[in-house]
Every structure is written in structure tokens, then in C-alpha cells.
Amino acid sequence: MEQRISIVTLGVRDLGAARAFYDALGWKIANEGEEAANIVAYDLHAMTLCLYLWDKLAGDAQVPPVGEGFRGVVLAYNVPGKEDVAPVLAEAEAAGGRIVKPAQDAFWGGHSGIFADPEGHLWEVAWNPFAPLGQRGEFQWKGCED
């Protein structure tokens, strides 16, 4: 198995509200029409983020659709500079997200904050001085070589 992720699918209870949030962040939907009524896809650099109804996603995975509170997953959005963290958090809040942890220096030497989207999915916005981003925003654990 190759070391990569193709799609991250987030289970949502309100597909319209979830789509409105990501649309408000300026993300462009990759699918339209009848297909987008059931699953919304956003093409990212080298992967896709999908939004799918919570119960349908659980049914497809053949697991019970239960779960509240921390789900054991935090998605990360890395930025090129320390000064970029707070504006991205503000953009998420303006789009309807909730700030969970304001921008602050992190124990590991970077700077980060966390917001929750309207469905409660956690997103860390981080600047990591030890892993500079590539020209297109690509992230690698030890930094991208351009």
C-alpha cells in the first residue's frame, strides 16, 4: 500500500450548512447537480475532502451512527508564517466556525489554534518552523524541498 491519502470524508448532520461553511471559506466545490445533493467534494492539493450525511456514512461503513464529543481526529491546515494563523482562524469564525483554541505559541515550537466547523470537526491552523510548506502549500513532516 502506498503512503498517501486520497479522500477524507467528514460525516455531517446538515449537508447544506456544512457546504455553506466551506463555501464561505472560499473553497470551490468539485461536483454539482444531483451528486452534490448527497455528497459534496472539494478537490485539494493531491487529495479531496468530502462532506457526507453522518447516518449514510456510518451505514456505508457498517457501524452505528453514534458519537459526540472528541472523535479522536484533528485535521490540520498549515500556513507559511506565524502571522498567518490568527487571520485564518478569524476567517473560519466569520464563516460560522467556532474558535476552540485561539492562536498561541505551541509547546513543540510552532504557533497554532483550533476551530470547529459547524458539525464539530476540529481543524488545527498551524505554522511549523521546522516544516516549511512547498510552493503550492504542500506539507511534509520535515518540510518540502522546492
Regions found by a protein language model. Give the residues of each.
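Vicinal oxygen chelate
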Residues: 1-6, 28-82, 86-116, 129-146
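Conserved catalytic core of two-component sensor histidine kinases
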Residues: 9, 16, 86
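Short, surface-exposed ligand-recognition loops at beta-strand->loop->(often short) alpha-helix junctions
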Residues: 10-13, 81
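Conserved beta-strand-loop-alpha-helix junction that forms the acyl-donor binding cleft
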Residues: 12-15, 106-108
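Amphipathic alpha-helical segments
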Residues: 14-29
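Conserved active-site tyrosine of GNAT-family acetyltransferases
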Residues: 18-22, 92, 120
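Short glycine-/small-residue motifs
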Residues: 124-125
